[in-house]
Amino acid sequence: MTRVITFVGNVTLLSKVIVKNKLTDVYVDQSYLYKVSDNGVKLPSTNEKAIFFKQDDINIQNLVSEGDGEITKGVGEKVRFHFVDTGIPPFKTSPSLMYSDGSDNEIVEMINRRVRIAKLISLIVNEIDDDLMFIDSDITVNNIDALLYSMSNRTKIGTLCIPAIAKPYNFVIMFCASTNFYLPREMRNDLLNVIQRYIASAKYVNTPVDIFINRELGSTPITWFGVCHHKYDKEWCI
């Protein structure tokens, strides 16, 4: 059985993606959890505003937005919540990480985010001994069952192409090296080794974690019609 996983971070669309993507597992990073709102602080490198949850406020009720989101995918099917802590709070330097000289707040948070993601993926892969389908918390996939079936005989990592904003520009491209990927069980150790090297060698200073993983593991791009990216109250779909 393939486990379908997201990790947060951003819980704004969580109740929607749980149902649409038929998630089996949600990993919650208690050191960095927020919901986009009309009021709140501006996140670095984005136009989003966010309300940050305090650690003692975090529970399943406030993660499934607007209070009526059910954490079910169907009759008798429930998603597992895993509450973890990467230990990297927002907008602060971490003594265990390397930063470039004169890093401003935006650069600090960019590096923090890369390492948070790397640590979360590593934690998940260590915990779950199965085939894994990672889907970001702002991505929805039409006909997820058919996608998983098409992946079931893969022996190598395959990454979903998603519509994404080409930073620092403002146009949308097809991006095929994200953290939306299928990982066969047999490649778990390969991925763990890649992430260990990424963190130990401070590759995060210059290279996004998703690009590093896809490059090092030689991922195959997968185009699937009905993949949508939700951001800034907009939706882009393939």
Curated annotation (Swiss-Prot):
This is Uncharacterized protein ORF238. It comes from Acidianus filamentous virus 2 (isolate Italy/Pozzuoli) (AFV-2).
